[in-house]
Amino acid sequence: MALETRPYDTAEHLKTPEHIAAYLDAVLEDNDPALLAHALGVVARAQGMAEIAQETGRSREQLYRTLSEKGNPQLDTLMGVLKAMGLRLSIQPVGA
């Protein structure tokens, strides 16, 4: 008898601002811009890509492209997306 599995979607588990912040903090530990762009896309899907697009004044398609592993969001896009998600960028000394 074969084991039946289904794809894991991180977006389904990002229900609270605390979960989202912890997820993005973990992604930032890898220091990988492509992974961060992808993770922001996952969070946008969890919160509703259409709503994030509307708040940022960008199309859903543009956000799907920008917030992917191949995307490279500009700083103004990054800041707008974070604001629409109810998040902000914070700077800390390395090792803090």
Predicted regions and their residues:
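Intrinsically disordered, low-complexity and often Lys/Arg-enriched segments
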Residues: 1-2, 92-96
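Short alpha-helical DNA-recognition segment
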Residues: 45-65
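DNA major-groove recognition helix of helix-turn-helix/homeodomain DNA-binding modules
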Residues: 74-92
